[in-house]
Design a protein with these regions (language model features):
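Short beta-strand element of the alpha/beta-hydrolase
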Residues: 50-61
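N-terminal cap/lid segment of alpha/beta-hydrolase-fold proteins
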Residues: 22-48
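Primarily recognizes the serine-hydrolase "nucleophile elbow" in alpha/beta-hydrolase
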Residues: 113-173
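C-terminal catalytic histidine-bearing segment of alpha/beta-hydrolase fold enzymes
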Residues: 226, 233-295
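Lipid interaction determinants
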Residues: 279-336, 342-390
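Mobile cap/lid helix-loop segments that gate and shape the active-site cleft of serine hydrolases
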Residues: 162-201
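Short beta-strand/loop motif that positions the catalytic acidic residue
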Residues: 205, 210-213, 217
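Short amphipathic alpha-helix adjacent to the substrate-entry channel of hydrolases
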Residues: 68-91
Length: 390
């Protein structure tokens, strides 16, 4: 079984569409001794007036980091579709993690320092510092939700696959954060966990919040979003929850095109309404999404000729040969399999192993395994890329 830490590292490096490097600024927001805290800034191409700011905090289970380096700042997957079209500045924030021998409180200090640095330098980036928002995915949602309560000018909050109340936590439903992660990251007491929970620290007039969650989330149970939204609404704020069937901790990954498209449209509408952005048609964004995501959908009719060859994932090779035969190579072990086509996919049958089901994306160069067993990986996809030289 895959470990919680390995799954979080996989999620933290999940599929994000590429954006133009010319519009992205990578710099250092603050330093702690010899440890630099980076910041990634994406400036919209067509903004004329001052632009609102969206601060994004990555997930990854608070894993990563060394004595000399923190995990990098990243941008959310919707940046390609919304930054230029809506004229929003996206700012990716970094913070010390468990590998830096840091705590949750240290991470909040890092993030506040970076946010304050950007706001103080807002004129350099043509930023409207009166219109800001925060967002995060997975472990980043816990941090970003707390930050959103600290800044009165924060108008919106966006959380995906989130954990917002560390006191209401059943490890059987939500393995993150487990007792070991809490101990390492300075959340071992009830008081510290409460301080790290936006649920217990709502500000007066909380920001308008959008919470995205899969109903099959095996790391952070979807009731975290439902309960947090209720808390916000009961406090006089405004919160919306969007739940997805058969989705497991992947609400903002283009590898799940239908869910990704709906999530981006929800975010776009939130930006338009709460940042008061005018003269933008949501249909333009929908068309861009349809065009960009077309090749991410599965190919309906797969033929043997499209599958023959070598397919590689991070640590496994799969070779399809003619006449329904093939080989899988994992950790220097080679096993022969039979394969057949059914239900729009390819089923691999290996002796004394569970059957595996693969689908080919329309681009013809990436196939993915869909996990259907009742495990932490249920409904997740693992990509394999075709080797062009075989």
């Amino acid at each position: 079984m895959i470990s919680i830490k390995s799954l979080f590292i996989f999620i933290g490096c999940s599929y994000v569409l590429n954006c133009s490097a010319q519009k992205t600024i990578d710099t250092i927001a603050t330093k702690l001794g010899n440890l630099a805290i980076p910041i990634k800034i994406y400036l919209p191409k067509k903004s004329i007036e001052k632009s609102p700011i969206y601060f994004f905090i990555h997930g990854g289970g608070w894993n990563g980091g060394t004595q000399n380096e923190v995990p990098p700042a990243t941008l959310s997957g919707d940046v390609e579709f919304l930054a230029d079209e809506l004229g929003v500045i996206y700012v990716g924030l970094a913070y010390r993690c468990k590998g830096n021998n840091a705590t949750f409180a240290d991470a909040i200090n890092d993030l506040e320092s970076s946010v304050n640095w950007f706001l103080e330098n807002g004129k350099r980036f043509n930023a409207d510092t009166t219109r800001i928002g925060f967002g995060g995915t997975s472990a980043g949602s816990t941090l970003s939700a707390v930050l959103a309560q600290k800044y009165p000018k924060c108008k919106i909050y966006i959380g995906a696959d989130g954990m917002y109340n560390l006191l209401d936590h059943d490890e059987k439903k939500s393995p993150f954060p487990n007792a070991e992660a809490r101990r390492i990251y300075g959340l071992e007491t009830e008081d510290k966990s409460k301080l790290a929970s936006a649920f217990h620290n709502l500000r007066k007039n909380p920001p308008v919040s959008l919470l995205l969650h899969g109903k099959e989330d095996r790391l952070c149970h979807y009731t975290q979003s439902i309960n947090f939204a209720k808390k916000i609404n009961d406090a006089g704020g405004k919160a919306k929850v969007v739940l997805y069937d058969r989705i497991n901790h992947t609400c903002l990954s283009a590898a799940y095109p239908e869910v990704f498209k709906q999530s981006v449209i929800e975010i776009a509408n939130l930006f338009l309404n709460e940042f008061n952005i005018k003269n933008i048609k949501i249909e333009t964004i929908q068309k861009a999404l349809d065009k960009r995501l077309e090749n991410q959908y599965p190919l309906e009719n797969i033929t043997e000729s499209k599958m023959i060859g070598l397919w590689k994932s991070t640590n496994e090779d799969i070779i399809f040969k003619p006449d329904g035969k093939g080989e899988q190579k994992f950790n220097n072990n080679v096993k022969v399999f039979d394969y057949l086509f059914e239900k729009g996919g390819v089923k691999i049958v290996v002796q004394q192993q569970k059957e595996r089901l693969f689908y080919l994306r329309k681009n013809g160069i990436v196939m993915y395994e869909l996990f259907s067993d009742d495990s932490e990986k249920m409904y997740r996809k693992l990509d394999f890329r075709k080797n062009k030289f075989r």
